[in-house]
Amino acid sequence: MLRNLLALRQIGQRTISTASRRHFKNKVPEKQKLFQEDDEIPLYLKGGVADALLYRATMILTVGGTAYAIYELAVASFPKKQE
């Protein structure tokens, strides 16, 4: 059993230490230029279509959740009639 645990430990270390190193291009300066431009476009639209859809979905869920909470508070404020 100890041998199995040691083998498992070695496999875990091997996969972490010998994983291929991927070099990603630093996109931060490009994004900074994009978002710092003064072109009268709202910030939440500068990210493209995905950001616009995410913003709209967030707004719809926020407004819908607020309306639902107010509705439930209104329903809870009126006691049910007992017959």
UniProtKB/Swiss-Prot annotation:
Keyword tRNA processing: no
Transit peptide feature, positions: 1-23
Record topological domains on the Mitochondrial matrix side: 24-48
Molecular-function GO term, any one: oxidoreductase activity
Single GO cellular component term: mitochondrial inner membrane
Function: Component of the cytochrome c oxidase, the last enzyme in the mitochondrial electron transport chain which drives oxidative phosphorylation. The respiratory chain contains 3 multisubunit complexes succinate dehydrogenase (complex II, CII), ubiquinol-cytochrome c oxidoreductase (cytochrome b-c1 complex, complex III, CIII) and cytochrome c oxidase (complex IV, CIV), that cooperate to transfer electrons derived from NADH and succinate to molecular oxygen, creating an electrochemical gradient over the inner membrane that drives transmembrane transport and the ATP synthase.
Subunit structure: Component of the cytochrome c oxidase (complex IV, CIV), a multisubunit enzyme composed of 14 subunits. The complex is composed of a catalytic core of 3 subunits MT-CO1, MT-CO2 and MT-CO3, encoded in the mitochondrial DNA, and 11 supernumerary subunits COX4I1 (or COX4I2), COX5A, COX5B, COX6A1 (or COX6A2), COX6B1 (or COX6B2), COX6C, COX7A2 (or COX7A1), COX7B, COX7C, COX8A and NDUFA4, which are encoded in the nuclear genome.
Protein name listed in UniProt: Cytochrome c oxidase subunit 7A2, mitochondrial
Organism for this UniProt entry: Homo sapiens (Human)
